[in-house]
Amino acid sequence: MLEHPQRFVRNIPDSSASSQQYPQQQQHPPQLPQHQNLNLNQNQNLNQNQIYQYRPQVPVPVPGSPAHHQRHSSLSQQQQLHHHRTLSTASSCSAQHKSVTFGQPALDCGGNGSGSANGSGSGNSSSGSAAGNAGTQSMAGNMKHGKSQDDVCYVVAKYDYAAQGAQELDLRKNERYLLLDDSKHWWRVQNSRNQSGYVPSNYVKKEKPSLFDSIKKKVKKGSGSKTLPNCSPSRQVESPTMSRRLPPDPAEAIGTAVVKYNYQAQQPDELSLTKGTRILILEKSNDGWWRGQSGNSVGWFPSNYTTEDCDNDGEIHTYAMAENVLDIVVALYSFTSNNDQELSFEKGDRLEIVDRPASDPDWYKARNNQGQVGLVPRNYLQELNDYLATPYRNASASAGNGNGGGSNGGAGGGGGNDSMERRNEGNKPAAQSSGQPIERPNLAGKSWYYGAITRSQCDTVLNGHGHDGDFLIRDSETNMGDYSVSLKAPGRNKHFRVHVEQNMYCIGQRKFHSLDQLVDHYQRAPIYTNKQGEKLYLVRSLPKANGT
């Protein structure tokens, strides 16, 4: 057996994590940082283009088609014909080289796609300005060809989506949008603020018409009235957005894998790997390259740099879907927004950081537990891991702070008592955080802990005595020290592996400081979402036979 995986001949530098500095606890909130490249005044209304002028233009890897040889569509045709990768096999006793040449792209489809991309790329400036003006057009003017006011169609966002260009539009999960054009893979929609743009069609679903609308439409058709199609030549100009492929549907993940070795992406459509992280597997190619997602990044990576997670019976684990969350932070101070683009929060609230604008480093884009998104001051926040690991200081002062306890104790807050408990749990001796073996926590008194039972026994108990949403946590059969969360679900029970690493409980791409924290999170957030958008939660711990 080889000691190392097949590697690229090219040097692969190790990725190093950059450390971030956070402010120390202060008695009063620090001075708010100034927005850069954007003059935000109170009650100022901004259009879509102005809002994102200061945001970084993060290049998104262009996912390829299922045919692996068409992945590098951004290269010229001549480069595609000669493009190849060289893999080397390294072992302790010998070194062998193996060349893998990607197949030539089909000229009838791959060539056309590349040409379209190049052609549209040269017109970005003019098309971008046209898209900016499109946001202010009336609803009737933006209507799809041949549609009257009675034929309007709405779509509902299945996932959040951040626009990557001037012609795209942000999506917020469960929000309703007017459908303007669905003739391409990217649909043109309009939000409630009359802002329009292109969105990936697999991130939205059409809203079912009501019975009244259906009857009204039939009556309209019977009258024989027809609407002439709009033959405006400007509608024939294809947006640059339309030439690139759709981003992956988060529900289409076929499994997960753990990265064994660092890998630095060598091409724009590749995915860099960091040892020890978990990635979602979206697609597998028979040449050994898989397409995956890590955070906001999507791309191809060498499968032999990873280990796929499997059950004891060989079945791929179903993991909690990865969210586009860069970090979890805790508010050290309360903050009241001064304009529509900022997000208010209370001291102790927990926020999800979804973007760190490079051009405005003192402000983060965050989402609260109500799903609201906005800009927040960085120096008002602290990473959750650092917050939990900080010894509890000045307990009497915090206990006497009625405002802080009141806001945190509410259903919408972060939970003041919860923060104190988690912080105490995270305050472990230094020997444990240094990588030394630690003792398993005492879970005997937990209602959801069933100890060392097999998966078969677990399914028997869930199916015999449980209802949908009941769950239990058991010791992992295949990995000593790990756990499994088993959930009673319609049709077939779900099992989620919890990997324990450096005092952290990892499930999917999320990490928790305790199993209590994990259970608390997935009782409020879905632990699984299927392709139809149905969500599963940890509703209730499965009652034990003795009633404890």
UniProtKB/Swiss-Prot annotation:
Keyword Phosphoprotein assigned to the entry: answer is: yes
Please name the GO terms of the biological process aspect recorded for this protein, alphabetically. Answer: axon guidance; myoblast fusion; negative regulation of insulin receptor signaling pathway
Q: What organism is the protein native to?
A: Drosophila melanogaster
Q: What is the lineage of its organism?
A: Eukaryota, Metazoa, Ecdysozoa, Arthropoda, Hexapoda
Residue ranges under compositional bias (Polar residues)?
Answer: 227-242
| Protein's UniProt keywords contain Transmembrane | no
Protein's name according to its UniProt entry: SH2/SH3 adapter protein dreadlocks
User: Where does the protein end up?
Assistant: Perikaryon; Cell projection, Axon; Cell projection, Growth cone
What gene name is listed for this protein? dock
Q: What happens when the gene is disrupted?
A: Pupal lethal with some adult escapers that are sluggish and uncoordinated and die within a few days of eclosion. Defects in R cell projection patterns with abnormal axon targeting and excessive axon crossing over and bundling (fasciculation). Identical to Pak mutant, R cells fail to find their proper targets within the medulla neuropil, fail to arborise properly within the lamina and medulla neuropils and terminate as thick blunt ended fascicles. Disruption of neuropil structures in the inner optic ganglia.
Where does the record place Gly residues bias? Answer: 113-122, 401-417
- What cellular-component terms does GO give this entry? cytosol; growth cone; perikaryon
**What GO MF terms are annotated?**
cell adhesion molecule binding; insulin receptor binding; protein kinase binding; protein-macromolecule adaptor activity
